[in-house]
Amino acid sequence: MDWVRGETVGHGSFGKVSFAIQRSQSTLVSPSMVVKSSSASSSSTLMNEKIILNELKECPQIINCVGDSYTYENGEKLYNVLLEYASGGALSDKLKNSGDHRLPEFEVRKYAKGLLKGIHYIHKNGYVHCDIKLPNILLGEDDQVKIADFGLAKRSESTKDDKLRCELRGTPLYMSPEMVTRGEQETPADIWALGCVVAEMATGNPAWRCSDIAKLLMTIGLGDQLPEIPEKLSEEGKDFLEKCFVKDPKKRWTAEMLLKHPFVADQDDTVSLNDERCYSETPSTSPKCPFDFPDWVTNDSAESSATCSITSLPSPANFSDGSWSTSPAERIWELVCERKPESEWSTADGWVSVR
């Protein structure tokens, strides 16, 4: 596709985002695309995003990738990914611009449902987003949710050995307990982050009130503390969040199950909160409905710096037998007290808007 770069929208640690216009269009036409660009020498994250978006292009709740190209600008070779333009902006901006910095419940329900549809499609196709948060949720012209920023996304893994190779990635305020304590970032981690997003939409505040990363990771990873459920939410909303904020990822509801929850489901799709017909007496590794949750046996008994997005934190120490540190506390200690150089704490939230 032959295109020209327009006005810069903003820039972050990965590079910059600008409007893009096809050469065949008049410059007076409203832009229908944006271009995400980074130096060709450090474009692996952007390339990963393009590959994954190509596989997820059939979902209306996921930002559409139009194409990619290389350009030479100001003596530098750039890698560019062309994306559809979400004219409604980021959901985080909508929240900030609302009257009391929170959304009415009918909008929370609408956006939660759209987000769930996108997450379900991502998971069904074998991927984990790894960085679900308000700034990465865009709104189209029709106010429809568009999940964006797949730079940290990865294939969902199926073996223990693969999980041991997982880096700590994402945004601390949205990280799941299993991500912090064991380095597991599979589909349940996206559901935990979804709960954080819903709580934030309902209150205007992050799910965790903590500005210190070390303290935040300790709170998420150790003990029984959970994010606070907003009092102003309906009983359906509170129950929805309780299904997202389950410490054990095996017992956390899946996107498919949550789509049938009364908080987001249409009347014909709703499963009653009091319906116990689907409970199972015996363990099952694959829940067949939202209420099929046996008692699995498990071995696991504010806004400032904590909002930074981490692409690669220090990996947990692997012992000769391939196991993690001997306890979650040791792993968290390694993360917060034995950091590698700051250059390895790559942040995606260094975004600066210029318009």
Can you name each region flagged by the protein language model?
Residues 246-251, 255-270:
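Terminal C-lobe "cap" of eukaryotic-type protein kinase domains
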Residues 152-154:
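Activation segment
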Residues 86-96:
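Structural motif in protein kinase domains
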Residues 16-40:
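Glycine-rich ATP phosphate-binding loop
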Residues 123-140:
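Catalytic-loop of the protein kinase fold
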